[in-house]
Amino acid sequence: VGFKAGVKDYKLTYYTPEYETKDTDILAAFRVTPQPGVPPEEAGAAVAAESSTGTWTTVWTDGLTSLDPYKGRCYHIEPVAGEESQFIAYVAYPLDLFEEGSVTNMFTSIVGNVFGFKALRALRLEDLRIPTAYVKTFQGPPHGIQVERDKLNKYGRPLLGCTIKPKLGLSAKNYGRAVYECLRGGLDFTKDDENVNSQPFMRWRDRFLFCAEAIYKSQAETGEIKGHYLNATAGTCEDMMKRAVFARELGVPIVMHDYLTGGFTANTTLAHYCRDNGLLLHIHRAMHAVIDRQKNHGMHFRVLAKALRMSGGDHIHAGTVVGKLEGEREITLGFVDLPRDDFIEKDRSRGIYFTQDWVSLPGVLPVASGGIHVWHMPALTEIFGDDSVLQFGGGTLGHPWGNAPGAVANRVALEACVQARNEGRDLAREGNEIIREASKWSPELAAACEVWKEIKFEFPAMDTL
């Protein structure tokens, strides 16, 4: 046969519309915007090639192996409604292309060099189907939803949190004081801001000590289990682990990590440590909008959320639908359910391109955070349901009477909404009424209602289908 040098069309090798996908394949849905003049089949095949075994020219060493078991295949192409120059390319990757238990390796292949590819104007990974065989190579979340509820002894309602503000500039002792006041007032958790690591005005060890003191004092006074997400994110993995170890020595229930800026390798390491040592792991998604906000390029957040469930985390920030940060309702609900449910049906109206079976990998609690306050409580309770964490930063600390009354207001609002829902009332329609009724017997809630009655963050969402 001989070796035929030269450049040949990708579609001859990598576009295979007759391919039957295997249960073990990783499936990807890409939104492709080709350069003018590049046909869809060629662009789709190019994506499959560049993210698997292909290179730009025929190489002699192809003859030393069979590409068939290893190549990515573009097996289906469909137009995007309302967009002339875009289409969705479906690509199947054989399982053997990926290292077991490594989100890092999976992303290096699937969203690696191919995103800088010249024949494409833009490329966005919309969804991934992770096969059972690959899911089973991951530990996943350190504990999951049920274990967390059992550790905290809190059932039948969403959990309440609060990010301590001002996020930068407080001394450790004043920071601990704010933590204590919020927990004492009735919150379940307080949170280090994602940018709080170990800065000159507050070194991590001092913060950990004062926060631990705040946790134990508020626990003793309320009889409830309390937690503060101690941010273990650091400049090196060794420093990160040092912080996690110190948190364990203090006996606190939960630590935190910024998984995108910290990286998947660091995150998976920390998740393994957390399972071995009984720590819950709260995950913040700082940097996600750099990757997921553009509609035609990058990666959708639902893919980042799936990756986090594999890498490991017990809480993941997932937008709010009602606050100050991006999130269309149906789409947000799609990636609220993805991390926490065992089985998610394909549903294009929610942006879900594939049915995903998580085969008993523990679930992750979605966290609603960003510009929310007591008036949003009915909507949040209805949209997110019991298995969620609702975080009010400014919505707690901005209370006119102080932090503890701010916490009281949120807890009263939540308990009122949960009770109303359990009595069969419609939170979507009667939400404001429920909050008003509750505020009659809670002066703290009444004051909060007064402060935030006019606040709205109304901009059209970017994340549309």
From Swiss-Prot:
Keyword vocabulary terms for this entry: Calvin cycle, Carbon dioxide fixation, Chloroplast, Disulfide bond, Lyase, Magnesium, Metal-binding, Methylation, Monooxygenase, Oxidoreductase, Photorespiration, Photosynthesis, Plastid
Q: Which GO terms describe its cellular component?
A: chloroplast
Q: How the cofactor binds, per note?
A: Binds 1 Mg(2+) ion per subunit.
Name one process (GO BP) from the record: reductive pentose-phosphate cycle
Enzyme class per UniProt: lyase
Positions annotated to bind Mg(2+): 191, 193-194
Q: Which InterPro entries match?
A: RuBisCO, RuBisCo_large_chain_AS, RuBisCO_lsu_C, RuBisCO_lsu_C_sf, RuBisCO_lsu_fd_N, RuBisCO_lsu_N_sf, RuBisCO_lsuI
- The positions annotated as site (Transition state stabilizer) read 324
Enzyme Commission code(s) on record: 4.1.1.39
> Binding of substrate: at which residues?
113, 163, 167, 285, 317, 369
Residue numbers of N6-carboxylysine PTMs = 191
The protein's PTM annotation reads: The disulfide bond which can form in the large chain dimeric partners within the hexadecamer appears to be associated with oxidative stress and protein turnover.
Metal-binding is among the record's keywords:
yes
Task: State the compartments where it is located.
Answer: Plastid, Chloroplast
| Homology family | Belongs to the RuBisCO large chain family. Type I subfamily.
Function of the molecule = RuBisCO catalyzes two reactions: the carboxylation of D-ribulose 1,5-bisphosphate, the primary event in carbon dioxide fixation, as well as the oxidative fragmentation of the pentose substrate in the photorespiration process. Both reactions occur simultaneously and in competition at the same active site.
Xref: PANTHER family? RIBULOSE BISPHOSPHATE CARBOXYLASE, RIBULOSE BISPHOSPHATE CARBOXYLASE LARGE CHAIN
Q: What is this protein called?
A: Ribulose bisphosphate carboxylase large chain
Gene name for this UniProt entry? rbcL
